Amino acid sequence: MGLNVKVLFFGSQNYVYSLTFGWFDKNCMKIKTLVLFLFLILFNDCNTTKSKTPANDSEHIHLEEFNAEFEKKIYEVAPGVYSAVGYGIANSILLVGKDGLVIIDTLDELKASKQVLEDFRKISSLPIKAIIYTHSHPDHIFGSGSFVTDVSPEVYAHESLLPTVQKLASETTPIIGTRSARMFGNYLEKSDLVNVGIGPYQGYNADTKLDFVPPTKTFRDSLNIEVSGIRLRLIHAPGETDDQIYIYHPEKNILFVGDNIYKAFPNLYTIRGTWFRSLKHWYESLDIIRNLKPEHLVPSHGKPISGKSYIYDIVTDYRDAVQFVHDQSLRGINAGYHPDDLVQLVQLPEHLKKSPYLKEIYGKVSWSVRSAFAGNLGWFSGDAAELHPLDRKVYADLIVDLAGGSENLLKYTKSKLQIKEYQTVLTLSGYLLRHDPKLTDVIPLRIEALEKLGVSESNANAKHYYLTEALELRNQFVAKIKVRPSPELLRRYPVKVILSSFVANLDPKLSFDTDEKVGFIFLDTKETYTIHLRKGVAEVIPSLIADADLIVELNSQDWKEMLTRLKSPATTLLKFRFKKGNLLSFTQFLKKFSPKEQILTLKVPTNQ
């Protein structure tokens, strides 16, 4: 005997759903249709976040209101102290001394830094005696070449800045470049860009030129200096980066705070990717500001702030917001919360939400909570199902199977698009495309969901990420930062950094049967290295091993420029000399190293 059952149930948005369960046999019940019923309930009422309808212009007010913060202008904070805002995503700051100048932060590229220097020269023609980096982010250091053309100023920074720059610019450059291009909207039309949350724009493109002058003087905890009669105290203040510093001008009671505070909820985590940013260190560093009680606060993004009590109140709210996220995240973590549930638990108090300096136009509380979990406990959520989780393709196949096939899930996804549940559409379209990349009918649904989410989003980073991914999917490309390093910039990077980056591109499948040692003699730097290629691993040894199978003599700059494609490999290789082995053997060695091609986020790697 069997049974036909028709069920009516009410979902969200007051829609009534009707499902007819087919013939149920005692020996072989149609489990899939029952699971489909449960699946629809789960996706409709429990596990998805309902998307808002697309915003009209008035709903962009939170992001657009901040445009005035980034107006291109040089502010006179006090006599002899100037902050240049709006020349790029970050500020550059000028201090005028008795017989020279101090520059704090140098913008993100040479064209912008040359322009700000020209305008600084309208204020003073004195020589630049010192440059101070507040931290290692590109928008604060890669314009430095403009400030050292005719002089050799001292360059001050925290002792950890240089190794951080070298690591960031070698190990994860490709993926952080891609995610940065999405986050900052480098591929978007100007009409799609309001601002980037902490500045007017970040405009890296193929014509962008960078240069970085390494520090000449570093310190660990604090350092008192005097430059051209200006007494300054440099203070280590880890926050947005571990190498962050403050610069205190005691005579004028001015504090330059880098990126530890700006007019937005802080980027306690950045979606372009970063190492863990300690929330505790961050709010403790904000307490340094409160203890110093400056009359003027000069951030490296946005306008200067004046008024001792006003600054104290702003910073108190700011540090309280960071500590609140830190403490309440730990409270939930210790209670056993899953990261997804922790995000729902930790919500800023209303009085902090009202602060004009805590609007979520750059950082977000939810991202910060997830980072707090990962930074304190690592990747494992505590759910045993995630010890050996289904891979993304298998999980997508399971979801499609539960839905009764891709046609059913596609139909359901379309229904969600009609009622403007864009986050649901984004999630389900990902399952469908991972299940079968040939389901081209899904792509327009996903693109529309991404675009609607982007239009309605007031967080600049999320907005640009949504819109750029829609563009990538529409035009089938992967966003990348197109900037190539200049020969001058490459010259400043040690050979060991370049080699470390090079060996990370080893294709193990081409080297599992290999055991060879290749020696490098860099004639210009008088350095020697050996790369021991051993069954899928390339070990860099900082010396020339006697039993090397192949030994090549070369110029380090040729090697760097060849690897970054500033020079043609075909012509550059002809300049190398071989003390042992030959060009053919060396070419075969090089072929074993190649970076994996980047894929669109929603795709599943083939692992070929």
Regions found by a protein language model. Give the residues of each.
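C-terminal motif of bacterial Sec signal peptides marking the signal peptidase cleavage site
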Residues: N44-D45
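Metallo-beta-lactamase
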Residues: E76, G100-L101, D108-L110, T164-I235, H281-K293, ...
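Sec-dependent N-terminal signal peptides
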Residues: T33-I41
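Accessory terminal helices/loops
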Residues: K50-E64, T173-G177, N186-V194, G199, ...
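Feature captures hydrophobic
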Residues: Y412-T427, Y431-I443, E448-Q608
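Active-site metal-binding motif and surrounding structural segment of the metallo-beta-lactamase
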Residues: E69, I74, K98-G100, L110-A157
